[in-house]
Amino acid sequence: MPGGKGKSVGGKGAPKDASGKTQRSHSAKAGLQFPCGRIKRFLKNNTQNKMRVGAKAAVYVTAVLEYLTAEVLELAGNAAKDLKVKRITPRHLQLAIRGDEELDTLIRATIAFGGVLPRINRALLLKVEQKKKSKIEA
């Protein structure tokens, strides 16, 4: 039926294996969004003497990376929302990571264009408050 209004002919459809079932990736089987196969390849290429890497190890590492990424993005999104902007910048990532104690200990790297955390030393703050009180009394 070329050119007609019917069922289209041809095309692969979903890829199938020899038994006729549709193929599912390791990521889909594990319910993950990050690519397990790619991370397994990175693990194999970056080990000494090209050591063997099990499939479950790659899935586990993928799940950990996906969880940490989701956690950081959620906190950075909250920081961006507090500042009433719609785009997450390195500043928001910095505020999110340094605001969470566990992420701060895990990620000790310097974030480019992240700025510094707003913090005033208590000793300086107390002197300013004392000056204000003395002016009010006088």
Curated annotation (Swiss-Prot):
Modification N6-acetyllysine, positions: 5, 12
Protein name per UniProt: Histone H2A.Z
Entry keyword annotation includes Nucleus: yes
Subunit structure, as described in the record: The nucleosome is a histone octamer containing two molecules each of H2A, H2B, H3 and H4 assembled in one H3-H4 heterotetramer and two H2A-H2B heterodimers. The octamer wraps approximately 147 bp of DNA. H2A or its variant H2A.Z forms a heterodimer with H2B. H2A.Z associates with the VPS72/SWC2 subunit of the SWR1 chromatin remodeling complex. Also interacts with RBP1/DNA-directed RNA polymerase II largest subunit.
Subcellular location: Nucleus; Chromosome
Predominant subcellular localization, coarse grouping: nucleus
InterPro entries named in the record: Histone-fold (IPR009072), Histone_H2A (IPR002119), Histone_H2A/H2B/H3 (IPR007125), Histone_H2A_C (IPR032454)
MF GO annotations: DNA binding; protein heterodimerization activity; structural constituent of chromatin
Comp. bias (Gly residues): 1-13
Changes after translation: Acetylated once deposited into chromatin.
A cellular component annotation (GO) from this entry: nucleosome
Keywords: Acetylation, Chromosome, DNA-binding, Nucleosome core, Nucleus
Gene: HTZ1
Family from the record: Belongs to the histone H2A family.
Phylogenetic placement of the source organism: Eukaryota, Fungi, Dikarya, Ascomycota, Pezizomycotina
CDD domains linked to this entry: HFD_H2A
Spans annotated as Disordered: 1-32
Protein purpose: Variant histone H2A which can replace H2A in some nucleosomes. Nucleosomes wrap and compact DNA into chromatin, limiting DNA accessibility to the cellular machineries which require DNA as a template. Histones thereby play a central role in transcription regulation, DNA repair, DNA replication and chromosomal stability. DNA accessibility is regulated via a complex set of post-translational modifications of histones, also called histone code, and nucleosome remodeling.
Xref: Gene3D superfamilies: Histone, subunit A (1.10.20.10)
